[in-house]
Amino acid sequence: TNTLSLEDHVSVIEEISIKHPSLCISFTIGNGKTPLDANIQAYQARKNEKFLVKKFQIYGEVNNILENSSLNDKKVKILHIDINDSSGFGNHLSPYETTIKVMKSYVLLMDKFLEKNSLTFFLGGDNFMIIAADLLEKDEISALLNSISYELDIKFNCGIGLGRTSRDSAKNATEALDFIRKLRKKGQNIPIYEIK
């Protein structure tokens, strides 16, 4: 999803090494039909010390690098989610209790979306980003979010972004979420919006 070749990964590590010589980093490359598949492949390559470039500690499977992937032309789907009116929690919850509610949301998002081979990340505050399986449709996303909303008595806003790269998709997802927020300020409630 980052569309970087193996050579691109090497040049990134070289540049970081020049700017920050005391920093030691490594990359693990994996891809698959779903984000979870890619994560598992990357994990296995790292665990089994399958180096693509040992000098720079780049791990992966030769047949998984971008140039050989049949997955190159697929679009990446990313969701940018926030909790609607989480600042309003302060009217009846302490900051600690608010944090618990946000963390419970995170755990449930991870659990529900992992069942759909998608990976959830906490961005801070009340924001989450999900690298979604491309087969996950808007209606299914809505149903998953509604089930969590019901369980925790909260509401989510969800921007869905599609793009050729993860950067494009994340940008589109954030723009979609910003659009939802603008509409909310005008009194319109659209909890999910998608930009392709």
Model-found features: residue ranges?
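Regulatory and interdomain segments flanking nucleotide-handling catalytic cores
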Residues: 1-196
